[in-house]
C-alpha cells in the first residue's frame, strides 16, 4: 500500500529512502492517501473524523480506515469516538491485535478484552469480531454498501488479529449469518450426546479444535457456530422484544439467536477472547442451558497457548 497509495506529506519526499529497492518502500508523496500519525491516537482519530464527515461538511464522500491497537481505541479516545457517532461519521475503525491472548507477551497494557463492550454503547457503531478473511470481506463490502450506496449514517468497528493461521473458503450461504451475527460453520453427527459450540475471533479456532476432541475422546457431537458479532445479536434481540411488546395481538417474532438454535440439541457454550460479559449479553434469547467462557482480568505476558490455558478459553476447557 505504501508504494501504491503513498504516505501523505505536504512537501513530498525530500530524501531517498534506504529501502527504495524493496516492494513496500517508505514512499512519501504530496498526493499520498495514507496518514501516518505515529503514537497519537487523539490526533489520528480527529483526522479520521474529518474524513468520515467530509460527505456532509465538504460534499465529498470518503470512507476512511483507521487501524490501531484495539486497546488504544475506545479505552483511550472513547470520548472522540462518541463525538464521531454524534457527528454521524461514516468509515471503518479497525482494532488490530485484538483479544486478550492474541498479542502474546505484551501484558495488561496492550491486551484488549473489552473494546466490543465499549463499542456497544455507541448507537450507530456496528461492530464485528470476525475470524476468517472471507468474513471480513463480507462485512467490509456490506459496510461500503450501507455507507456509500444507501447513505446510512453508521460507522464500523472491526477487530482483527495478528495471529497467522489458515483461512478456509467461505461456507455456502453464510453471508446473511455473517452480517446478522452468527452462522453455522459445521454440523456434527447424530449421536445421542450433542452440544452447540459458539466461537468468535481467533478463539473460534480453539472451538473448532474442541469439537474434534469431544467427538474423538468423549463421543459427543458438536455443531460449531461462528459468531461475528454478539453486539449485533443483542441489538436484534432487543428490537424483537420491543416489537413483541408493542404488538401484543400479533404473532410474536423470534430473535435471530432463537431462530438459529431453537431446533438444535444440547447445551450452548460460547468462547471468545473477550470478557464474559461480551458473549453473556445474548443469554435472554438462547434456548436451554448457556455457558460462557471469556478472558476476564488483566492481560499477562506469555505465549498464546499459555495465556489461553490461563484464561480457560482454550480447546481443553
Where do the language-model regions lie?
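Thiamine diphosphate
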Residues: 1-168, 175-177, 237-247, 260, ...
